[in-house]
A protein has these predicted regions:
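Non-heme di-metal
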Residues: 2-216
Length: 216
């Protein structure tokens, strides 16, 4: 018995012999499947499927309630908007409970890889398939929207992979060339090859520094 986890959709599953060719859930190719230790005690059970459904349901509810809050605010219902947002926060925590049961949260490097693979699936497979189906059924405007969003997901994948490369090379806060660093808390500017351990102005730790960029 071997245990695998899909780096795209997060499905954990077991097989008796050989190696899986595709993910049983999302259909992504076998090179996106990672062999893991049997750490998910729910693997292969109906309970695992229930946890996945619960996570999906709570996640979708959280998003819907934020959209509803925005609409309520525009229509002048401040209290209702606030209650939608409060409930959305509750749903977010519910989703997190089930995602953690599925061992869905790793360290930052693992999370960046999972995010990159997820974005890859969306732009190379999911939206491409959706666009073709929409075209076949005569929904050409929607097909174009699918393709436009797919292009954005491609950018997302590239961003995550660039960040992962920095984490793996320990170059998040240290570069080979002189750079301009900015404290995200107070705006203090430092010029050098690495960020300071503490911000000289607000004393926030190195984690608050990022490369300074002007996009205006």
């Amino acid at each position: 018995m071997k245990s695998y986890k899909c780096s795209v959709c997060g499905l954990a599953f077991d097989i008796q012999d050989g190696e899986p060719a595709v993910c049983p859930k999302c259909g992504v190719s076998g090179d996106k499947l990672v062999q893991v230790s049997a750490t998910n005690k729910y693997a292969g059970t109906q309970t695992e499927k229930n946890l996945e459904a619960a996570f999906a349901g709570e996640s979708q509810a959280r998003n819907k309630y934020t959209y509803f809050a925005s609409k309520a605010k525009k229509e002048g219902f401040e209290q209702i908007a606030a209650l939608f947002l409060k409930t959305a926060d509750n749903e977010k925590e519910h989703a997190k409970l089930w995602f953690k049961e599925l061992n869905g949260i790793g360290d930052t490097a693992q999370n960046l890889l999972a995010a990159a693979e997820g974005e890859n699936y969306e732009w190379t497979d999911m939206y491409d398939s959706f666009a073709k189906t929409a075209d076949e059924e005569g929904f050409h405007e929607l097909a174009e929207k699918f393709r436009l969003v797919a292009a954005i997901e491609k950018e997302h994948e590239e961003r995550y992979r660039a960040l992962l490369k920095n984490v793996e090379a320990q170059e998040v806060f240290k570069k080979s060339e002189v750079k301009v660093w900015e404290c995200r808390n107070c705006g203090h500017i430092v010029v050098g090859t690495k960020a300071p351990e503490l911000c000289p102005t607000c004393k926030h730790p190195k984690a608050y520094f990022e490369l300074h960029a002007e996009n205006y």
